[in-house]
Amino acid sequence: MRIEYSDVFLKSTKKLTDKIAVKRLKELIVKLENAISLNEIPNVVPVKGSVGIYRIRTGDYRLIVEYWNGDVTILLLEYLKRDENTYKN
């Protein structure tokens, strides 16, 4: 799949200081690039109330992505540390 990066995603990853989280994110991006569909990626869950928005668990972090079936492009929206405020608007 082709990967695109949102400004929010780039900003959130620049602030990362956890080396393990950075390593896991890089590995996940490589998996996404090599995948044909999201079904090939483990820990993918659709976000309730949103069409085409998914979250992918990597340790204590969640990668929020936008993906439309039939489209080979995935937009990385945000990379968040999982806590009680993660999914609040």
Q: At which residue positions do the language-model features occur?
A:
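Enriched for short, Lys/Arg-rich terminal
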Residues: 2, 8, 19, 41, ...
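A short, surface-exposed loop/turn module that caps and links secondary-structure elements
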Residues: 30-55
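Arg/Lys-rich, positively charged N-terminal/basic patches that mediate binding to nucleic acids
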Residues: 1-28
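A short, compositionally biased N-terminal segment around positions ~18-40 that is enriched
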Residues: 19-38, 67
